[in-house]
């Protein structure tokens, strides 16, 4: 783990030097683990459910705290889901959920660690996907195998590319919630001024040509972005590589593929075509966008609604597209799963599972996607009449879902 952390520090430094871009999450792999049901696990789930039913019959209410991250539409979605649950299933089963804002993913993770030591954790929390393994291996998360199997939750209904980070050593520790991929955002009004349209930027050569044209013809930046491993990994994946090797004990940035990726961005930065920021300055990218001083930036599909609001306010046309193709298309996934903490009572665990099921069911997956811009996590959600109608009205929202077909293994864990 120490060696891996050192590698990740090196990668972050390289990412900052290259101006390689950013995102809102991290890894994905193309494998789905199977869950083995044990008698002990089933008995555990039965006992917890019986406890919850007895408490409901006696009029007791189980109070749960649920921690979430981010403000804006994401915050509204979390608050609305908790309220809707409390008014329906919660009222029926004697469960009340209080949703509490905890800042960024990193801030939430730090608070969870401190709360676990003090035995004051919430019952549930969102968790950035690349962090799940670390928390699970340290015994902080509840193994969900028994809950999933006893409840008959169809894990196969979740999009396959979103599942790997839910598993640790073939056991389930989280359910896909607000999930994302990095995508390309464009101010198409600026691109048009330079003779380009976002729909024509399909390859790295196109990206370089469009960004150069913007800089030369308008004096604005072709691309603005802050550095982060997530998008750097997407660029490496598109070159048939990754930022770490398969065993995560060596960086691949010093390979021909790594040098090509870093060299591409370094040249554009040196020419003043790309406005690069370090990984702590992501707000400055938003400032460039709001000042109409950049044509292209890369970010999470979860930022779609915020970017649409900016475009509407400032009167420019927003475009979204796949990460431009190098040797091939490719992307990691990001965002968060919902997890259950391991140090709560059986009564609280039974109640927490009810909320986890509710917030990741098809109807709520549809609502969350439309509300926030994150991916619809379930196939039944993405294929629903409601989502299909939404995609017809808002085709920009379908880009990330279509890009899921190109998800590749991202060999790294959260450096935090």
Show where each model-derived region lies.
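Extracytoplasmic "Venus flytrap"/periplasmic binding protein-like
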Residues: 90-158, 189, 193-195, 202, ...
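Short, polar/charged alpha-helical segment
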Residues: 54, 72-96
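Glycine-centered hinge/linker elements that transmit conformational signals in sensory
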Residues: 210-213, 249-278
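Extracytoplasmic/periplasmic substrate-recognition and gating elements
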Residues: 87, 93-96, 194, 263, ...
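C-terminal capping/gating helix-and-loop segments adjacent to ligand/active sites or protein-protein/ligand interfaces
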Residues: 396-416
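Short, well-ordered beta-strand elements
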Residues: 60-72, 95-100, 123-124, 173, ...
């Amino acid at each position: 783990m120490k060696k891996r952390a050192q590698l990740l520090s090196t990668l972050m430094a390289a990412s900052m030097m290259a101006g390689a871009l950013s995102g809102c999450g991290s890894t994905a792999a193309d494998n789905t683990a199977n869950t083995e049901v044990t008698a002990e696990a089933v008995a555990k789930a039965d006992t917890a459910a019986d406890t919850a039913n007895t408490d409901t019959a006696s009029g007791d209410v189980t109070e749960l705290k649920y921690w979430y991250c981010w403000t804006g539409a994401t915050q509204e979605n979390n608050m609305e889901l908790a309220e809707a649950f409390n008014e329906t299933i919660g009222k029926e089963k004697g469960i009340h959920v209080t949703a509490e804002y905890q800042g960024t993913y990193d801030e939430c993770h730090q608070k969870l660690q401190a709360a676990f030591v003090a035995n004051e954790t919430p019952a549930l929390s969102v968790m950035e996907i690349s962090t799940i393994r670390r928390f699970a291996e340290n015994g902080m998360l509840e193994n969900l195998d028994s809950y999933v199997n006893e409840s008959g939750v169809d894990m196969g209904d979740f999009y396959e590319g979103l599942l790997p980070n839910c598993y640790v050593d073939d056991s389930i520790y989280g359910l896909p919630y607000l999930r994302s991929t990095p995508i390309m955002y464009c101010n198409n009004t600026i691109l048009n001024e330079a003779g380009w349209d976002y729909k024509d930027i399909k390859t790295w050569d196109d990206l370089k040509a469009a960004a150069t044209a913007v800089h030369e013809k308008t004096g604005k930046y072709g691309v603005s972005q802050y550095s982060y491993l997530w998008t750097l990994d997407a660029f490496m994946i598109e070159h048939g590589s990754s930022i770490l090797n398969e065993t995560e004990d060596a960086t691949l940035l010093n390979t021909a593929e790594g040098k090509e990726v870093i060299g591409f961005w370094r040249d554009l930065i040196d020419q003043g075509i790309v406005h690069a920021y370090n990984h702590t300055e992501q707000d400055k990218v938003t400032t460039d966008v709001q000042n109409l001083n950049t044509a292209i930036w890369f970010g999470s599909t979860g930022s779609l609604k915020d970017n649409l609001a900016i475009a509407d306010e400032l009167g420019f046309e927003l475009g979204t597209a796949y990460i431009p193709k190098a040797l091939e298309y490719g992307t990691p996934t990001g965002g968060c799963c919902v997890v259950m903490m391991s140090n709560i009572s059986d009564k609280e665990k039974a109640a927490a599972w009810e909320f986890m099921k509710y917030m990741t069911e098809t109807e709520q997956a549809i609502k969350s996607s439309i509300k926030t811009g994150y991916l619809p996590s379930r196939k039944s959600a993405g294929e629903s009449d409601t989502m299909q109608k939404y995609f017809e009205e808002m085709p920009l929202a379908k880009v990330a879902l279509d890009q899921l077909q190109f998800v590749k293994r991202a060999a790294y864990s959260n450096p935090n």
